[in-house]
């Protein structure tokens, strides 16, 4: 059957977060603040996600991603906004 949509969203989110982490460097954590996904067609079999940074600065980063099936057809797209912040240290509240 087709790939479950939640798995597709998770893959697109992780692809975008990875490019933000690569850009931001070590010592930071990346948190999604806004995510929009469009499902274009059912995905059967393996799916590959790719992402790129489209803008932003030191605190917020904007990204786009797409998922393609084994035939190279785009099956889903996403846009996300990610917050970049210093990693919490031991004893620091996680919800700040």
Label every PLM stretch briefly.
Residues 4, 25-27, 70:
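Residue-level detector of alpha-helix boundary/anchor positions
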Residues 17-48, 53-54:
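Hydrophobic beta-strand-centered segment that forms part of the acyl-chain substrate-binding groove
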Residues 1, 38, 58:
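Flexible, active-site-adjacent loop/turn segments at secondary-structure boundaries
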Residues 1-17:
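Hot-dog-fold acyl-thioester-processing enzymes
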Residues 12, 21-22, 72:
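Short, function-defining helix-loop hinge/capping sites that tune catalysis or transport
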């Amino acid at each position: 059957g087709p790939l479950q949509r939640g798995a597709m969203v998770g893959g697109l989110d992780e692809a975008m977060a990875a490019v933000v982490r690569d850009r931001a460097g070590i010592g930071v954590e990346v948190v999604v603040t806004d995510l929009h996904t469009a499902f274009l067609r059912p995905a059967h079999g393996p799916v590959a996600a790719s992402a790129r940074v489209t803008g932003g600065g030191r605190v917020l980063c904007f990204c786009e991603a797409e998922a393609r099936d084994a035939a190279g057809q785009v099956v889903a797209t996403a846009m996300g906004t990610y917050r970049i912040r210093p990693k919490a240290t031991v004893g620091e509240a996680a919800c700040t």
